Amino acid sequence: MDDEDMSCTSGDDYAGYGDEDYYNEADVDAADDVAVTPTHSEEADYECLSVNQVERVFIDGVNSLVSRISINEKFARILLQANHWDVDKIARLVRNDRNDFLRKCHIDAKPEPKRKLSSTQSVLAKGYCSVCAMDGYTELPHLTCGHCFCEHCWKSHVESRLSEGVASRIECMESECEVYAPSEFVLSIIKNSPVIKLKYERFLLRDMVNSHPHLKFCVGNECPVIIRSTEVKPKRVTCMQCHTSFCVKCGADYHAPTSCETIKQWMTKCADDSETANYISAHTKDCPQCHSCIEKAGGCNHIQCTRCRHHFCWMCFGDWKSHGSEYYECSRYKENPSVAAEANHVKARRALEKYLHYFERFENHSKSLKMEEELRDKIRKKIDDKVNEHNGTWIDWQYLHKSVSLLTKCRYTLQYTYPFAYFLSATPRKNLFEYQQAQLEKEVEELAWAVERADGTARGALEAHMHRAEHKRQTLLHDFFF
């Protein structure tokens, strides 16, 4: 695709692109006539840009700053990156104390006490590189700080910093000097090394995009598109090239009603705890008498705690002596008795149980979304068959396609209510949220039941299910997300 043709806006038609996206809003836009009209948009106002188009965005930002303050373009980029491309903020800080601000942004060096050099030292200083200890150079590259080093040492320094992933913050080699090298300076040093130059430009683009609040790399696999949004909010964008959808603020999967900070905590916790939690949940229980954690080694349900010697049933936690005759086929369930002062390991078990409660439901809805993709394919085939049999047109049966798309949308939102609820403090607000969550879950499952039995469900009844589910979803998002 040509760079000039890559630009698109969020108003473009994405219909049909969302086959692998569980939350493709475009798929259900046409269902709005049977659902609730949202008062807030979950879709960001954005456009998809190529690298060349993004470079023009950077140039416009530099020109805007240069027109406001008297500064060289190469330093304007450093200022903009350090201040998240906020031209007004930079202009204000420059007016307050220009010299101090430029030092804080690593453009000017901190004042150094002047040292008196001997005549021999003065001669050497003019052509001497203190890194390689070679002299005789007629010209030594240097930054605004004036510290001179030979081109070979500069190149080695640039390569070293690039190997560490640093591009826009390559500093002077002088000890304790914090002046940054502008991109023009670095490119002049590595101009004869195309491989290093390519790596530097790639890393520099990464740093520039990451510093810009309205730019975000598409998270699709090896996708070159860069998204530019008009607002920095956790809203959904869809790449026009690879059709990947994600949150434009944090780059994660779209996660309403959960915030970016909360979903990051949740995903970290899942990555750290899930395998351990699953094993502990499946293989261990607490002794009902001393609350020690016990791992069951065999198939027998008669357990003796090694700590307190208490005999109990693995299945129901009942005292083994009074358990009855059906020792090995116990079907009773009894919760652990509450204790006034829980030991640390008991508190850990309670925390684990809480985590598993939310994690299992989060995962269950994720699995349901995958299975409902198969349902989507079946409904598409069903519609095609009916149309081919001259039993109505695609428009006549489109409501079936809309129903599964809306089901997907509602279940996706429901899935992300569980991380939100996990981190929510026990307050009246949480009670309200859990009530609305339960209402949404009820409507989602009723809609799923109706969609799976679409042949036996009248169109009016199915559309009523769709309306109720979307109404509950919008109400929850309005109260806890927008």
From Swiss-Prot:
What family does the database annotate? Belongs to the RBR family. Ariadne subfamily.
Question: Under which name does UniProt file this protein?
Answer: Potential E3 ubiquitin-protein ligase ariadne-2
Q: Which PANTHER family match?
A: RBR FAMILY RING FINGER AND IBR DOMAIN-CONTAINING
Gene Ontology terms, MF aspect: ubiquitin conjugating enzyme binding; ubiquitin protein ligase activity; zinc ion binding
Catalytic activities: [E2 ubiquitin-conjugating enzyme]-S-ubiquitinyl-L-cysteine + [acceptor protein]-L-lysine = [E2 ubiquitin-conjugating enzyme]-L-cysteine + [acceptor protein]-N(6)-ubiquitinyl-L-lysine
Q: Where does Zn(2+) 4 bind?
A: 247, 250, 255, 260
N-terminal signal peptide: none
What residues does Zn(2+) 1 bind to?
Answer: 129, 132, 150, 153
What are the record keywords, sorted? Coiled coil, Metal-binding, Nucleus, Repeat, Transferase, Ubl conjugation pathway, Zinc, Zinc-finger
Q: What does this protein do?
A: Might act as an E3 ubiquitin-protein ligase, or as part of E3 complex, which accepts ubiquitin from specific E2 ubiquitin-conjugating enzymes, such as UBC-2/UBE2L3, and then transfers it to substrates.
Localisation: Nucleus
Binding positions for Zn(2+) 5 per the UniProt entry? 287, 290, 305, 308
Q: What is its EC number?
A: 2.3.2.31
Q: Which CDD domains does the record cross-reference, listed alphabetically? A: BRcat_RBR_TRIAD1 (cd20344), Rcat_RBR_TRIAD1 (cd20360), RING-HC_RBR_TRIAD1 (cd16773)
Binding residues for Zn(2+) 2: 145, 147, 172, 177
Which region ranges are annotated with the description TRIAD supradomain? 125-334
Q: Which amino acid positions bind Zn(2+) 6, per UniProt?
A: 313, 316, 323, 330
Q: How are the domains described in the entry?
A: Members of the RBR family are atypical E3 ligases. They interact with the E2 conjugating enzyme UBE2L3 and function like HECT-type E3 enzymes: they bind E2s via the first RING-type zinc finger, but require an obligate trans-thiolation step during the ubiquitin transfer, requiring a conserved active site Cys residue in the second RING-type zinc finger. The active site probably forms a thioester intermediate with ubiquitin taken from the active-site cysteine of the E2 before ultimately transferring it to a Lys residue on the substrate.
List the catalytic residues. 300
Which InterPro entries does the record associate with it? Ariadne (IPR045840), BRcat_RBR_TRIAD1 (IPR047555), E3_UB_ligase_RBR (IPR031127), IBR_dom (IPR002867), Rcat_RBR_TRIAD1 (IPR047556), TRIAD_supradom (IPR044066), Znf_RING/FYVE/PHD (IPR013083)
